[in-house]
Amino acid sequence: MLVLLAGIFVVHIATVIMLFVSTIANVWLVSNTVDASVGLWKNCTNISCSDSLSYASEDALKTVQAFMILSIIFCVIALLVFVFQLFTMEKGNRFFLSGATTLVCWLCILVGVSIYTSHYANRDGTQYHHGYSYILGWICFCFSFIIGVLYLVLRKK
């Protein structure tokens, strides 16, 4: 049981780190023709990065930014709640609060990455492919779901 809890803790920390990288890095879309990439915050070329995004005024991008930030906040809160429950909870109880908070993080990732996918990542005729930040977002989606379900199922022994 201790090994399982330690493994979940390590995966949870990795998820927090990957969420930070996914949200901060500017590699959600990468151009196939020129050396350029676009993120949630900046547009980067091989020379420099600029804060001016051609679609920055769109509400969809602001929604994606908000939900990705919320997912980081809920993931960190869930990690802190798990550590707190690990040391204060009585034996035999389940990690309901940690699991619920992690599943809220999972929903925030789902909404954020899905909106980005529907508005920006699937345009026909474009010369772009998905960058590592976008892929990390979906990996964090999977990890946070697995962690959340495991928190709900596990009991403290």
Swiss-Prot record:
> What's any one GO cellular component for it?
plasma membrane
Signal peptide stretch: none
Q: Which GO terms describe its biological process?
A: apoptotic process; bleb assembly; epidermis development
* Main location, first listed in the record: membrane
Could you tell me where this protein is found in the cell?
Answer: Membrane
**Topology with regard to the membrane?**
Multi-pass membrane protein
* Listed transmembrane segments: 1-21, 67-87, 95-115, 134-154
Kindly provide the name given to this protein in its UniProt entry.
Epithelial membrane protein 1
Organism name? Homo sapiens (Human)
